[in-house]
Curated annotation (Swiss-Prot):
The gene is rpsK. Disulfide bonds: none annotated. GO terms for cellular component: ribonucleoprotein complex; ribosome. Pfam families: Ribosomal_S11 (PF00411). One of its GO terms (biological process) is translation. This is Small ribosomal subunit protein uS11. Part of the 30S ribosomal subunit. Interacts with proteins S7 and S18. Binds to IF-3. InterPro entries: Ribosomal_uS11, Ribosomal_uS11_bac-type, Ribosomal_uS11_CS, Ribosomal_uS11_sf. Belongs to the universal ribosomal protein uS11 family. Located on the platform of the 30S subunit, it bridges several disparate RNA helices of the 16S rRNA. Forms part of the Shine-Dalgarno cleft in the 70S ribosome. GO terms for molecular function: rRNA binding; structural constituent of ribosome. Keywords: Ribonucleoprotein, Ribosomal protein, RNA-binding, rRNA-binding.
Length: 131
């Protein structure tokens, strides 16, 4: 018997009207991920260098982080976002570029905080590369 054509109807994203939110920038050696949330932590928008089509070593560049932050900021500003607190995590190259890009997109930055986790001598790090 033939399967009935069942189409899933996708809901249209509603505008949330949020004035103040948080931007979480995770910048690793391989990629940069920017997530913009409301004050509670519910995600409004996100973007990453890999999601924008950057592949391989180009994902870890400051330009890729800048583009990711710009894309996430424009999507969040459609929800009425005007000001953000920025939380930066990781040692990557795109940290400062992403922050500057958020400011250039028209968002007012009220706080910049480094939340990189620092071990109190926890796990053993990977061995040094000998190239």
């Amino acid at each position: 018997m033939a399967k009935a054509n069942t189409r899933k109807t996708r809901r249209k994203k509603e505008r949330k009207n949020i004035e103040h939110g948080c931007a979480h920038i995770k910048s690793t050696f391989n990629n940069s991920i920017v997530t913009i949330t409301d004050a509670v932590g519910n995600a409004l928008s996100w973007s990453s260098a890999g999601a924008l089509g950057f592949k391989g070593s180009r994902k870890s560049t400051p330009f890729a982080a800048q583009m990711a932050a710009e894309t996430a900021a424009t999507a969040a500003m459609e929800h009425g976002l005007k000001s953000i607190e920025v939380y930066v995590k990781g040692p990557g190259a795109g940290r400062e570029a992403a922050i500057r890009s958020l400011q250039a997109a028209g968002l007012e930055i009220t706080l910049i905080k480094d939340v990189t986790p620092i071990p109190h001598n926890g796990c053993r790090p990977p061995k040094r590369r000998r190239v």
